[in-house]
């Protein structure tokens, strides 16, 4: 009996726990290395637009610049302002970073490649992205300074404005896919769509939701910029107005955690756009040599394409005024996304093509 309970404990609890921890550590390492090079790519793209070289000294072509920056931040001493609430001040960057990383627990980068392939994966990511505002509000309030506090208030209003639009975008995709499971959303873009209707099922690129839902793709792209405080919606950390926004009192490792959380959140939005609109890990053409390439490579290429679009917005679009930002969210995107939900639902119902 004792042997039975011991074996049940090992196979039913301990071994799955060890596997999950190993998967989490592997994902964390891969994600952090990817973020280092995404940050470098962001700086390189910005430099190319401005006809500069960008980071090119540390390592060949500047490939180790992000690791040099990491070492610099870690070796600096964190300074806490005299009037700050020390506990909340130090907890804020940790909250921001951990919540951003937690979203990747449900994101599949290939078929079956997810730590937790839950049936409500989209809702989980939506909830995590909504909670990320708390790290910024904690930082703004605990710094005991007017610039971070004003940035925190801006951030709260900005994220509430664009969360609603992103929610309606997700609803339109769910109507087409018929599921909240992220892997099932990708598989739905392989099984049915325009390519199947015209008798060319190998052209999976025609099944991607970016084509029938292109207005919602644009809304998602712009809302993702606002959600992650990226230019031209970087009013939370506007250098010309608020110095560095909610991070003005931060330095050393806490500042590094905020930057890490910001770029992980950007990467999460790119991954979500890849899954919802660009077919996830599916090749554009389901024929050799395209389907010889591993799905995770296609996923990474599409993710970087989305990041390139976000980086280009930083380089070429001027910053919006705060009232313009609010007007765009509430008077343009919210009505547009709501109308699109009604149109998509009507077309699916009356055409008889709604998923069963």
From Swiss-Prot:
Locate the transmembrane regions by residue number: 18-38, 87-107, 120-140, 166-186, 205-225, 265-285, 292-312, 333-353
Q: Which UniProt keywords apply?
A: Cell inner membrane, Cell membrane, Membrane, NAD, Quinone, Translocase, Transmembrane, Transmembrane helix, Ubiquinone
* Cellular compartment(s): Cell inner membrane
- Claim: Cell inner membrane is one of the keywords in the record: yes
Catalytic activity line of the entry: a quinone + NADH + 5 H(+)(in) = a quinol + NAD(+) + 4 H(+)(out)
Query: What do we know about how this protein assembles, alone or with others?
Result: NDH-1 is composed of 14 different subunits. Subunits NuoA, H, J, K, L, M, N constitute the membrane sector of the complex.
Q: What protein name is recorded for this chain?
A: NADH-quinone oxidoreductase subunit H
Recorded source organism is Bradyrhizobium sp. (strain BTAi1 / ATCC BAA-1182)
| Gene encoding the protein | nuoH
